[in-house]
Regions:
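Donor/substrate-binding cores of folate-linked one-carbon enzymes
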Residues: 1-95
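Internal anion-binding site segments
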Residues: 88-242
Length: 242
């Protein structure tokens, strides 16, 4: 605090590509997460950390901070500072609203970086997903594919992937796969290679095991997602802190 007030601060910090998060102890007041701050402890977010990883990192930090806060209250040597005093200049406060199904449904028209961070921020729960349908049969009920772990495919690596499968150019949402070792989906400026996934009705598995039972992957396509619009809703236009 004061950043990421709301229901899902860990998730949104990862979704937004932050490099630093932390734990805060604070006083309760009439509004949500706005009370005076007592203690704060930082925690680094590594480039491949998921929300689950950060949760596990923060647990021992939070436990120790609670002990220190209680001791400070008992000994009456802890100060409380208003949250406004932690805001630097024109710094914008980012919210952490409830995670919705619309946020979890991946919009492949977004950038590789944004999709990668979205998937990390929703893993392992509630989990980002895409919907698959056979090409030319878009009226059929789609199959949901949950996505737990990925890698970014950008620049020369992306061009090499296209060359490997005999493509010159692709539209966002196009499935790219050799049917054996990789399963990727094109974004606005590259692709996301999916490493750990779960098809509806199946167990969670890694890519090679998935492809062993998912024939002709490039004969499928994805449905339109909603995550990009949901992320835009959560992006503050200005600092509304008074």
């Amino acid at each position: 605090l004061p950043q990421y007030r709301g229901a899902a601060p860990i998730n949104w910090a990862v979704i937004n590509g932050e490099r630093l998060t932390g734990v805060t102890t604070f006083m309760i007041d009439k509004d949500i997460d706005t009370g005076g701050i007592m203690l704060r402890q930082d925690c680094r977010i590594e480039p491949d950390d998921t929300a689950g990883d950060i949760h596990d990192k923060l647990m021992p930090i939070g436990a120790q901070l609670v002990v220190e806060t209680v001791q400070g209250i008992i000994e009456r040597n802890i100060e409380t500072r208003v949250q406004r005093s932690f805001i630097q200049g024109s710094e914008v406060l980012k919210p952490a609203p409830k995670l919705t199904r619309e946020l979890c449904h991946i919009d492949w028209n977004d950038t590789t970086k944004n999709v990668y961070n979205l998937i990390r921020g929703l893993s392992p729960y509630p989990t980002a997903f895409t919907e698959l349908v056979p090409e030319g049969e878009e009226t059929k009920a789609p199959a949901q594919l949950k996505v737990f772990a990925t890698e970014k495919v950008e620049g020369e690596e992306f061009r090499s992937m296209l060359e490997h499968i005999g493509k010159d150019n692709v539209t966002p949402g196009t499935i790219l796969s050799d049917g054996k070792g990789f399963f990727a989906i094109a974004t606005a400026d590259g692709a996301i290679s999916i490493k750990d996934m779960q098809l509806a009705g199946k167990k969670r598995m890694e890519v090679k095991a998935f492809l062993a039972g998912f024939r002709n992957p490039m004969s499928w396509t994805t449905t339109a997602g909603t995550s990009k619009a949901e992320m835009e809703k959560a992006r503050p236009a200005s600092n509304t802190e008074e």
